């Protein structure tokens, strides 16, 4: 099934967030960076966006969205073709038992009024959780509004979507290939069910469970009380760098860049 990783978010302390936002390397070489406020018909959020060719990172301050506290984080996925979200929904229903599925249409507030943005699906949380994961299926009205073209075989194109947001074509950041998580037992169980409904395969080695599909991988280590859920993010680069560099941002973020990878560490 054509389910892709789309983006992730991490909630950072203000000092760390501002250090990233003021970095010349981040803004001039690594990625397209912007401070944005997004409004829907039910909520709004404000954060720093680090955009690459195929995926992006949302970095929030505490309270950047309602209920967010430092270290709260999440992973967002997208379907490639219309109707795939319904297939996932049926698979989830057969896996979940008594757990509820949360699904709805997100409507975006734009300069031209309200535009249907994407359908989303997740395992229903009782309240804002420290870790979230969800699936999006972008609405045809929004793709038309932003003039985002599908591929020749009718698939959603992450690069075309990000290009519509004025993402630089010369920045280093290409895609996210790996995310390393520390999750509680219940958080891992819910993520595993969602990934299973996407068609991900899994394997275990020691205390690490790996979930993978195509060129994307998630590694999970189970913890009783993890401080940060997203601990490491491996990004692919468009070109190989000969000189390795390390950048430290505040107390809770570090970026190691070298060869064809950039590795973020949080917490």
Annotate the PLM regions.
Residues 1-18, 172-183:
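Terminal, regulation- and interaction-focused segments at domain boundaries
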Residues 16, 80-84, 184-188, 237-241:
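Helix N-cap motif at beta-to-alpha junctions
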Residues 65-78, 224-229, 241:
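Long, folded non-catalytic interaction modules
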Residues 32-73:
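Glycine/small-residue-rich interface belts in oligomeric ring/scaffold proteins
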Residues 5-7, 45-47, 72-74, 176-178, ...:
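Extracellular structured ligand-interaction cores
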Residues 18-33, 88-94, 185-202:
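Amphipathic alpha-helical segments
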Residues 90-175, 186, 198-267:
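Vicinal oxygen chelate
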Residues 74-93:
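Long, charged/polar, surface-exposed segments that mediate recognition or autoinhibition
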């Amino acid at each position: 099934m054509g389910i892709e990783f789309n983006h992730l978010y991490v909630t950072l302390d203000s000092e760390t967030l501002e250090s990233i936002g003021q970095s010349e390397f981040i803004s001039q070489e690594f990625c397209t960076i912007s401070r944005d406020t997004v409004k829907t018909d039910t909520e709004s959020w404000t954060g720093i966006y680090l955009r690459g060719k195929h995926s992006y990172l949302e970095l929030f301050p505490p309270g950047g969205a309602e209920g967010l506290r430092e270290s709260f984080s999440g992973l967002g996925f997208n379907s490639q073709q219309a109707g795939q979200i319904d297939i996932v929904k049926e698979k989830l229903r057969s896996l979940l038992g008594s757990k509820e599925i949360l699904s709805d249409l997100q409507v975006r507030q734009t300069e031209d009024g309200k535009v249907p943005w994407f359908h989303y699906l997740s395992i229903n949380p009782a309240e804002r959780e420290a870790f979230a994961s969800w699936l999006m299926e972008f609405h045809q009205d929004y793709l038309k509004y932003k003039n985002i073209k599908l591929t020749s075989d009718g698939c959603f194109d992450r690069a075309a979507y990000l290009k519509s947001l004025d993402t630089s074509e010369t920045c280093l950041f290409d895609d996210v290939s790996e995310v390393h998580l520390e999750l509680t037992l219940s958080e891992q169980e819910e993520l595993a069910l969602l990934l299973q409904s996407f068609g991900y395969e899994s394997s275990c080695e020691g205390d690490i469970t790996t979930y993978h599909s195509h060129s994307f991988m998630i590694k999970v280590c189970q913890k009783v009380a993890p401080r940060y859920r997203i601990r490491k993010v491996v990004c692919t680069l468009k070109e190989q760098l000969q000189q390795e560099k390390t950048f430290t941002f505040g107390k809770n973020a570090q970026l190691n860049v070298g060869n064809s990878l950039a590795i973020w560490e949080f917490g």
